[in-house]
């Protein structure tokens, strides 16, 4: 079969009103909220909030950890923010690669330029999912140059998470899918359809299980395949 079907299993509610980005780490589940723009770190089992901090990001849609920092996609200012891991204070901000008007808003009179959604880190590089460009941009954070890009495989890319063999899980909220892609050209190896009404906004992987957050329902859960 060319696809699988995932059943969302709700684990707990996010402490913020609209969770929009997730990152699993040994010390807990990190989340960025797009309304209060706070970062939260929760216990995987209970959902207990272990840490929270207010950020100066705007309508944020992605979070990851790497190089000793927190990275956040500050979507509505088209920036990628680099934050102190202990305090949550912004250290620097960089232009979001692929920023622009998303395809489904191009003809709207009030169309607004926006930036990235999901983020991931590997090998000293930052992987940035951009709905406006419909690409995954691979950035060198040392000099903020793009070293590669590949198609995201859909209309509205959102969360991303590392899969097996160095491949990347990529969610698309317009099609309700999660696809496993290689990171040079974007070749797709697997597609998972996510049962409605859940939408995979933020996404991460913990103990070989994909976790997601849904900004519409405020829920955080797992995808059971």
Residue positions per predicted region:
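Blade/loop signatures of beta-propeller domains
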Residues: 1-5
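Beta-rich, blade/repeat-based domains predominating
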Residues: 13-26, 56-67, 97-123, 153-165, ...
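Short loop/turn segments that connect beta-strands within beta-propeller blades
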Residues: 43-47, 84-88, 140-144, 182-186, ...
């Amino acid at each position: 079969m060319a696809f699988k079907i995932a059943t969302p299993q709700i684990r707990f509610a996010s402490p913020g009103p609209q969770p929009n980005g997730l990152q699993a780490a040994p010390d807990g589940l990190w989340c960025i909220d797009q309304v209060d723009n706070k970062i939260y770190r929760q216990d995987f089992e209970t959902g207990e909030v272990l840490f929270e901090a207010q950020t100066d990001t705007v309508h944020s849609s992605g979070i990851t950890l790497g190089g000793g920092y927190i990275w956040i996609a500050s979507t509505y200012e088209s920036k990628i923010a680099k934050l102190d891991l202990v305090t949550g204070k912004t250290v620097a901000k960089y232009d979001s690669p692929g920023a622009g008007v998303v395809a489904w808003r191009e003809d709207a009179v009030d169309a607004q330029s926006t930036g990235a959604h999901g983020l991931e880190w590997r090998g000293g590089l930052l992987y940035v999912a951009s709905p406006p460009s419909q690409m995954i941009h691979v950035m060198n954070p040392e000099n903020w140059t793009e070293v590669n890009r590949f198609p995201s495989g859909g209309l509205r890319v959102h969360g991303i998470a590392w899969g097996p063999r160095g491949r990347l899980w990529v969610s698309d909220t317009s099609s309700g899918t999660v696809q496993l892609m290689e990171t040079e050209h974007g070749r797709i190896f697997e597609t998972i359809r996510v049962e409605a009404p859940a939408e995979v906004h933020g996404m991460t992987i913990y103990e070989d299980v994909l976790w997601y957050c849904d900004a519409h329902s405020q829920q955080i859960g797992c995808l059971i395949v």
